[in-house]
Amino acid sequence: MLAAALRAAGVDVSGWSQTGQYALWLVAMAVLALILVSFGAVISGMTVWWEMRVSARMQSRIGYNRVGAAGFFQWIADAVKLLLKEDLIPADADRLLFRAAPYFVLVGFALVFVALPFGESLIAADLNVGIFYITAVTALVVVGILVAGWSSNSKWALFGGMRSAAQVISYEIPAGLAVMVPVLMSGTLSMQGIIRSQGAWPWEWHALTNPFAMVAFAIFFVAQLAEGNRTPFDLPEAESELVAGYLSEYSAFRFALFFLVEFGNLWVMSAISVTLFFGGWQVPFAGPEVFAAARGAGDLPGLAWWGLQLASMLVFVAKTLVLLNVVVWVRWTLPRIRVDQMMSLCWKYLVPFAFVCFVATLLWQILVARVPATAPVVGGLMLVAAIVAGFSFLRLTRRNISAVGDRVDFTNW
């Protein structure tokens, strides 16, 4: 693709030496890495703004409204403020590890975007083991958190790091078993392959074509909340118990890196869920043959192909925002649970249910999925059930609001 772009720009690369082509590849990889980190930072900042606006709406207050329209650029002001603060390192801290810990976390976060498909061709690397790669690189985040807690030479930071390590290691098991459900349904570990095995319509998504896949999604979603240290699983940063947990001794730029990753993970976990269970970037009325026809036979694709790529990205972002709202809703609704409750939930409930979903999906694929027209029929029935459940929930919510004499205030949005 890079060589094709250079040829289209009038650059003849046929006579370049092997060293020159290798140097060009290194430059391209460096630019790609910079783009990924910058993109992750922008995603994190916009997620902060979105959560603050949604949480303000939920609590009938204004929220961000000073810097930019509807406070949209407030996250930039916050980032500049953190960058200009004094960077303090405790006198008794392990200075090398204290400095390195935020970069472990940042690298683990940024590497996820390599295999995350934002569109039909909008992916840095379509790895044939994409979901396995994402599971592996996200483990770097907990390494950084544990190193941050240890190197701070503070009991509160150490307790926070140890809690995070125990939490992530425990919830990786149900998350991994839940991920195996869409892998079994699609027959591939590739993120793009998992998306292409689904369809654009809701009754073609993995979450609705198999009753056990919806349960697997719920397990995966809860496990991702725990791995991301989100309420009600924010025990590593519990202010009432550990000051700020592993972040207690961090300030300025290094604190900003942790902050960036924490909010960026909200987007990542929602995007992974959309990819595995909700059809990813699939665009209605635009199947693979439409993308292939728009691509054409030339070195560089035409305008129609780029339009389809934009449409697929918008579909992916819209689905991700829906799940992101659910994450925000959970945070501002549920209280923090205790450590023993967190571990009991994982080992006594999520792990057994995830294993049952895995085995049941195995049997479903062998005995039921091969029957013609099974997927659309099951998908349609589950879609109707989901719509009925959603309207029932909204009706119950409206009844509860009326019963207590409360009102929904739209004036502050």
Curated annotation (Swiss-Prot):
It is an enzyme of class 7 (translocase). It catalyses: a quinone + NADH + 5 H(+)(in) = a quinol + NAD(+) + 4 H(+)(out). It is a multi-pass membrane protein. It is found in: Cell inner membrane. GO terms for biological process: aerobic respiration. Its EC number is 7.1.1.-. One of its GO terms (cellular component) is plasma membrane. It comes from the Bacteria. The chain crosses the membrane at residues 23-43, 104-124, 129-149, 175-195, 205-225, 258-278, 310-330, 349-369, 374-394. Keywords: Cell inner membrane, Cell membrane, Membrane, NAD, Quinone, Translocase, Transmembrane, Transmembrane helix, Ubiquinone. NDH-1 is composed of 14 different subunits. Subunits NuoA, H, J, K, L, M, N constitute the membrane sector of the complex. NDH-1 shuttles electrons from NADH, via FMN and iron-sulfur (Fe-S) centers, to quinones in the respiratory chain. The immediate electron acceptor for the enzyme in this species is believed to be ubiquinone. Couples the redox reaction to proton translocation (for every two electrons transferred, four hydrogen ions are translocated across the cytoplasmic membrane), and thus conserves the redox energy in a proton gradient. This subunit may bind ubiquinone. This is NADH-quinone oxidoreductase subunit H. It comes from Anaeromyxobacter dehalogenans (strain 2CP-C).
